[in-house]
């Protein structure tokens, strides 16, 4: 198995600087496709590095990029494009994808980051390869017709001890091409409670998209 190359840096998005971390397959191996990892309000791209998710994804042949959302982590100086709990125009995440040259990515979106990812997911002509919502906020702000139009494959993930997970699932289940991973005994950041189950389920889902 080839090694993994890691780097970090900053991109300019709509006039603001956003920090990112990236892991790639080593040895000049071409990545299969890109995975963009977002995060919740108490977390940052460092969460995915410490958990080993970036490394595991790169090891499996994917380009894994985690950003720090505006106002959080090492993007603290950047101003959020909308108040917490309000939907951010899809153009914001489109600009992130463009700045990082990701191509059509899979987006992993826990909790707070739903305000960024859901408009991007449901935008007309969305270029998402896949979507992995982990109990995201704002699921009630998307209408049934917009959910029904989504063509991307979706893996809905949540912990069975997380009321928000069940609430968000009631909306997300309207996505036509979805499967569900419920983690027993896990809370809101279920990927932290059950990292092995998280990585196994995620890699299995990605394998099916290849």
Curated annotation (Swiss-Prot):
The EC number on file is: 2.3.1.-
Q: What GO MF annotations does this protein's record show?
A: hydrolase activity; protein-lysine-acetyltransferase activity
Q: Which UniProt keywords apply?
A: Acyltransferase, Cytoplasm, Nucleus, Phosphoprotein, Transferase
Q: Which residues form the active site?
A: 111, 162, 188
**Which reaction is this enzyme known to catalyze?**
L-lysyl-[protein] + acetyl-CoA = N(6)-acetyl-L-lysyl-[protein] + CoA + H(+)
Under InterPro entries, the record lists:
AB_hydrolase_1 (IPR000073), AB_hydrolase_fold (IPR029058)
Query: Quaternary structure?
Result: May interact with TAF1.
Q: To which species is this protein native? A: Bos taurus (Bovine)
What family, per the record? Belongs to the AB hydrolase superfamily. ABHD14 family.
Q: What does the record give as the function of this protein?
A: Acts as an atypical protein-lysine deacetylase in vitro. Catalyzes the deacetylation of lysine residues using CoA as substrate, generating acetyl-CoA and the free amine of protein-lysine residues. Additional experiments are however required to confirm the protein-lysine deacetylase activity in vivo. Has hydrolase activity towards various surrogate p-nitrophenyl (pNp) substrates, such as pNp-butyrate, pNp-acetate and pNp-octanoate in vitro, with a strong preference for pNp-acetate. May activate transcription.
Please give the chief subcellular localization of this protein. Answer: cytoplasm
Q: Name one Pfam family in it.
A: Abhydrolase_6
Q: State the Gene Ontology BP annotations.
A: positive regulation of transcription by RNA polymerase II
Protein's recorded name:
Putative protein-lysine deacylase ABHD14B
One of the record's GO cellular component terms: nucleolus
At what positions is Phosphoserine found? 91
The UniProt entry's coiled-coil ranges are: none
Subcellular localization is given as: Cytoplasm; Nucleus
> What domain of life?
Eukaryota
